[in-house]
């Protein structure tokens, strides 16, 4: 989801949104994190949530996923983001059949791989990712799709020998960064603050 389906990171967006709404309660973030990253994500999702309607979606990937769904593929949104946020995004995009997200434990890297293998078996699923954390998930995927890869990740994905689609960032880096940061939203927020 983060950096793949959307051009931003929901945890970072949630932290900024929390700090904007509750600047004097910044210290809570540290206490929440002391109980683990899953707890931090849960508490942020309970307190603030970025709007699924205004997130900077990867339009090329969304279009491809829509095509896959029409062709009969079962689409599962598996993310390390909090399940509440993932559910909101799945509802907004209306392309996913199932949603897996962080609840009691952070559904990242090896934990995500374990969840997918338990549901679909070894080499029983295709997976779209973008970061080194996705390498663990790709090791058990039948096809490795890559979207907006972090530096060095594409070569490591190719090394697995099962690369499918590669979605590159559409546009120049400054334009992508501006879209991911959603500066126009923060400008409006500053005017309201």
Task: Explain the meaning of each model-derived region.
Residues 1-45:
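Active-site neighborhood of HAD-like aspartate-dependent phosphohydrolases
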Residues 7-13, 38-50, 57-60, 83-86, ...:
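Cytosolic catalytic headpiece of P-type ATPases
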Residues 52-193:
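C-terminal cap/substrate-recognition subdomain and adjoining C-terminal extension
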């Amino acid at each position: 989801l983060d950096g793949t389906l959307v051009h931003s990171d929901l945890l970072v967006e949630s932290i900024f949104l929390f700090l904007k709404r509750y600047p004097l309660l910044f210290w809570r973030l540290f206490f929440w994190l002391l109980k683990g990253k899953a707890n931090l994500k849960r508490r942020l999702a309970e307190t603030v949530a970025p709007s699924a309607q205004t997130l900077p979606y990867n339009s090329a990937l969304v279009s491809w996923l829509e095509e896959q769904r029409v062709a009969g593929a079962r689409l599962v949104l598996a993310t390390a983001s909090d399940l509440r946020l993932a559910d909101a995004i799945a509802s907004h995009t209306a392309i996913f059949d199932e949603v897996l997200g962080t609840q009691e434990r952070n559904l990242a890297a090896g934990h995500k791989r374990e969840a997918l293998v338990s549901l679909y078996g070894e080499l029983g699923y295709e997976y779209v990712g973008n970061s080194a954390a996705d390498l663990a998930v790709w090791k058990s995927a039948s096809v490795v799709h890559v979207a907006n890869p972090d530096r060095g990740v594409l070569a490591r994905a190719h090394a697995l020998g099962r690369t499918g689609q590669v979605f590159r960032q559409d546009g120049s880096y400054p334009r992508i960064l501006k879209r991911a940061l959603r500066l126009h939203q923060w400008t409006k927020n500053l005017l309201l603050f």
